[in-house]
Amino acid sequence: MDQLQQSLLDAPIIEKNGYHYFVHPISDGLPKLDPTLLREIVIRIIRKAELQDVDRIVTPAAMGIHISTAVSLMTDIPLTVIRKRKYGLEDEVAISQQTGYSENEMYINDVRAGERVLVLDDVLSTGGTLASVLEALDGIGAEVIDTVAVIKKVGGENKVDDAGYDVKTLINVDVVDGEVVIVDEHGDS
Protein backbone atom coordinates (compact mmCIF):
# COMPACT_ATOMS: atom_id res chain seq x y z
CA MET A 1 0.00 0.00 0.00
CA ASP A 2 1.39 3.41 -0.94
CA GLN A 3 1.78 6.32 1.48
CA LEU A 4 -1.06 8.38 0.02
CA GLN A 5 -3.53 5.53 0.45
CA GLN A 6 -2.37 4.71 3.99
CA SER A 7 -2.37 8.37 5.03
CA LEU A 8 -5.98 8.71 3.90
CA LEU A 9 -7.05 5.57 5.74
CA ASP A 10 -5.43 7.02 8.88
CA ALA A 11 -6.99 10.49 8.45
CA PRO A 12 -9.32 11.81 11.16
CA ILE A 13 -12.85 12.80 10.08
CA ILE A 14 -14.64 15.98 11.14
CA GLU A 15 -18.18 17.16 10.46
CA LYS A 16 -18.97 20.72 9.46
CA ASN A 17 -22.53 21.78 8.62
CA GLY A 18 -23.53 18.17 7.98
CA TYR A 19 -20.63 17.59 5.59
CA HIS A 20 -17.91 15.04 6.49
CA TYR A 21 -14.29 16.02 5.88
CA PHE A 22 -11.06 14.09 6.27
CA VAL A 23 -8.18 16.04 7.81
CA HIS A 24 -5.09 15.31 5.74
CA PRO A 25 -1.63 16.87 5.26
CA ILE A 26 -2.24 17.50 1.55
CA SER A 27 -5.63 19.17 1.98
CA ASP A 28 -5.23 20.76 5.42
CA GLY A 29 -1.54 21.00 6.25
CA LEU A 30 -1.97 18.73 9.25
CA PRO A 31 -0.94 16.37 10.56
CA LYS A 32 2.59 17.11 9.37
CA LEU A 33 3.33 16.60 5.68
CA ASP A 34 6.06 14.01 5.37
CA PRO A 35 8.40 14.85 2.47
CA THR A 36 8.24 11.26 1.23
CA LEU A 37 4.44 11.58 0.87
CA LEU A 38 4.81 14.86 -1.04
CA ARG A 39 7.49 13.30 -3.26
CA GLU A 40 5.26 10.29 -3.99
CA ILE A 41 2.39 12.60 -4.96
CA VAL A 42 4.56 14.81 -7.17
CA ILE A 43 6.02 11.81 -9.01
CA ARG A 44 2.52 10.43 -9.58
CA ILE A 45 1.29 13.79 -10.89
CA ILE A 46 4.24 14.05 -13.28
CA ARG A 47 3.54 10.53 -14.56
CA LYS A 48 -0.21 11.12 -14.95
CA ALA A 49 -0.45 14.69 -16.24
CA GLU A 50 -0.05 15.78 -19.84
CA LEU A 51 2.99 18.07 -19.59
CA GLN A 52 3.99 18.41 -23.25
CA ASP A 53 4.11 22.09 -24.26
CA VAL A 54 2.58 23.34 -20.99
CA ASP A 55 3.50 27.01 -20.50
CA ARG A 56 2.54 27.24 -16.85
CA ILE A 57 1.00 25.50 -13.88
CA VAL A 58 -2.04 27.20 -12.36
CA THR A 59 -3.31 26.40 -8.86
CA PRO A 60 -5.84 27.89 -6.47
CA ALA A 61 -4.62 29.12 -3.07
CA ALA A 62 -3.94 27.82 -0.59
CA MET A 63 -3.58 24.05 -0.44
CA GLY A 64 -2.59 23.56 -4.07
CA ILE A 65 0.49 25.73 -3.61
CA HIS A 66 2.83 23.20 -1.99
CA ILE A 67 1.96 20.49 -4.52
CA SER A 68 2.25 22.82 -7.50
CA THR A 69 5.51 24.34 -6.27
CA ALA A 70 7.07 20.89 -6.03
CA VAL A 71 5.80 19.95 -9.52
CA SER A 72 7.13 23.26 -10.87
CA LEU A 73 10.56 22.58 -9.35
CA MET A 74 10.67 19.09 -10.88
CA THR A 75 9.45 20.12 -14.36
CA ASP A 76 10.80 23.68 -14.72
CA ILE A 77 7.28 24.85 -15.62
CA PRO A 78 6.46 28.29 -14.14
CA LEU A 79 3.67 28.55 -11.55
CA THR A 80 0.80 31.01 -11.13
CA VAL A 81 -1.29 31.00 -7.94
CA ILE A 82 -4.94 32.02 -8.06
CA ARG A 83 -5.17 34.29 -5.03
CA LYS A 84 -7.89 35.05 -2.52
CA ARG A 85 -6.76 38.68 -2.39
CA LYS A 86 -7.58 41.31 -5.00
CA TYR A 87 -4.56 43.21 -6.34
CA GLY A 88 -6.34 45.37 -8.90
CA LEU A 89 -3.84 44.64 -11.67
CA GLU A 90 -4.81 45.23 -15.30
CA ASP A 91 -5.32 41.60 -16.29
CA GLU A 92 -7.01 40.51 -13.04
CA VAL A 93 -10.04 38.24 -13.44
CA ALA A 94 -12.38 37.72 -10.48
CA ILE A 95 -14.00 34.34 -10.02
CA SER A 96 -16.57 33.12 -7.53
CA GLN A 97 -15.38 30.07 -5.59
CA GLN A 98 -18.21 27.91 -4.25
CA THR A 99 -17.24 24.93 -2.12
CA GLY A 100 -19.28 22.55 -0.02
CA TYR A 101 -19.05 24.93 2.91
CA SER A 102 -18.36 28.48 1.69
CA GLU A 103 -18.41 31.03 -1.11
CA ASN A 104 -15.49 33.40 -1.76
CA GLU A 105 -13.94 35.51 -4.47
CA MET A 106 -10.62 34.49 -6.01
CA TYR A 107 -8.46 36.35 -8.50
CA ILE A 108 -6.46 35.17 -11.50
CA ASN A 109 -3.55 37.34 -12.58
CA ASP A 110 -0.87 36.94 -15.25
CA VAL A 111 -2.57 34.23 -17.34
CA ARG A 112 -3.08 35.20 -20.96
CA ALA A 113 -5.06 34.04 -23.98
CA GLY A 114 -3.30 31.25 -25.83
CA GLU A 115 -1.22 30.09 -22.88
CA ARG A 116 -1.25 26.33 -22.37
CA VAL A 117 -1.85 25.53 -18.71
CA LEU A 118 -1.87 22.59 -16.33
CA VAL A 119 -4.31 23.09 -13.46
CA LEU A 120 -3.40 21.37 -10.18
CA ASP A 121 -5.33 21.17 -6.91
CA ASP A 122 -5.33 19.17 -3.71
CA VAL A 123 -8.90 17.84 -3.48
CA LEU A 124 -11.87 17.54 -5.82
CA SER A 125 -14.96 17.30 -3.65
CA THR A 126 -17.99 19.32 -4.79
CA GLY A 127 -16.00 20.64 -7.75
CA GLY A 128 -16.97 24.24 -7.04
CA THR A 129 -13.45 25.62 -6.97
CA LEU A 130 -12.14 23.74 -10.01
CA ALA A 131 -15.28 24.42 -12.08
CA SER A 132 -14.94 28.16 -11.39
CA VAL A 133 -11.22 28.11 -12.19
CA LEU A 134 -11.67 26.16 -15.43
CA GLU A 135 -14.53 28.40 -16.59
CA ALA A 136 -12.44 31.51 -15.86
CA LEU A 137 -9.43 30.12 -17.73
CA ASP A 138 -11.69 29.36 -20.70
CA GLY A 139 -13.00 32.93 -20.51
CA ILE A 140 -9.45 34.30 -20.55
CA GLY A 141 -8.69 32.18 -23.61
CA ALA A 142 -6.06 30.00 -21.96
CA GLU A 143 -5.83 26.44 -23.24
CA VAL A 144 -6.23 23.97 -20.39
CA ILE A 145 -4.02 21.05 -21.40
CA ASP A 146 -4.78 18.97 -18.32
CA THR A 147 -6.28 19.18 -14.85
CA VAL A 148 -5.16 17.01 -11.94
CA ALA A 149 -6.43 16.84 -8.37
CA VAL A 150 -4.59 14.65 -5.89
CA ILE A 151 -7.66 13.32 -4.07
CA LYS A 152 -11.25 12.97 -5.28
CA LYS A 153 -14.00 12.66 -2.71
CA VAL A 154 -16.82 10.80 -4.48
CA GLY A 155 -20.52 10.84 -3.70
CA GLY A 156 -22.68 13.89 -4.05
CA GLU A 157 -22.70 16.75 -6.50
CA ASN A 158 -19.65 17.40 -8.65
CA LYS A 159 -19.80 20.72 -10.51
CA VAL A 160 -16.75 19.87 -12.63
CA ASP A 161 -18.44 16.80 -14.09
CA ASP A 162 -21.68 18.75 -14.54
CA ALA A 163 -19.79 21.45 -16.49
CA GLY A 164 -18.21 18.85 -18.79
CA TYR A 165 -14.59 19.17 -17.65
CA ASP A 166 -12.29 16.17 -17.23
CA VAL A 167 -10.12 15.98 -14.12
CA LYS A 168 -7.52 13.31 -13.51
CA THR A 169 -7.06 12.22 -9.90
CA LEU A 170 -4.48 10.13 -8.08
CA ILE A 171 -6.92 8.42 -5.71
CA ASN A 172 -10.70 8.43 -5.18
CA VAL A 173 -12.19 8.12 -1.70
CA ASP A 174 -15.47 8.39 0.16
CA VAL A 175 -16.28 8.95 3.81
CA VAL A 176 -18.56 6.20 5.13
CA ASP A 177 -19.58 5.82 8.77
CA GLY A 178 -16.86 8.21 9.89
CA GLU A 179 -14.02 6.53 8.00
CA VAL A 180 -12.23 7.07 4.72
CA VAL A 181 -12.95 4.31 2.20
CA ILE A 182 -10.72 3.89 -0.86
CA VAL A 183 -13.02 3.77 -3.90
CA ASP A 184 -10.29 3.67 -6.58
CA GLU A 185 -6.63 3.50 -5.57
CA HIS A 186 -5.55 4.70 -9.04
CA GLY A 187 -7.99 7.60 -9.36
CA ASP A 188 -9.46 8.90 -12.60
CA SER A 189 -7.42 9.05 -15.79
From Swiss-Prot:
Pfam families referenced in this protein's UniProt entry, alphabetically: Pribosyltran
Secretion signal, residue range per the UniProt entry: none
A GO term, aspect molecular function: transferase activity
EC number: 2.4.2.-
Gene3D superfamilies registered for this protein in UniProt: 3.40.50.2020
Coiled coil: none
SUPFAM superfamilies linked to this entry: PRTase-like (SSF53271)
Alphabetically ordered keywords of this record: Purine salvage, Transferase
GO terms (BP aspect): purine ribonucleoside salvage
Enzyme class: transferase
PROSITE patterns: PUR_PYR_PR_TRANSFER (PS00103)
Role this protein plays: May catalyze a purine salvage reaction, the substrate is unknown.
NCBIfam families listed in its UniProt record: HPT_Archaea, PRK02304.1-4
Matches recorded under HAMAP family: Hypx_phosphoribosyltr (MF_01467)
Assigned protein family: Belongs to the purine/pyrimidine phosphoribosyltransferase family. Archaeal HPRT subfamily.
Protein name: HGPRTase-like protein 1
Provenance organism: Natrialba magadii (strain ATCC 43099 / DSM 3394 / CCM 3739 / CIP 104546 / IAM 13178 / JCM 8861 / NBRC 102185 / NCIMB 2190 / MS3)
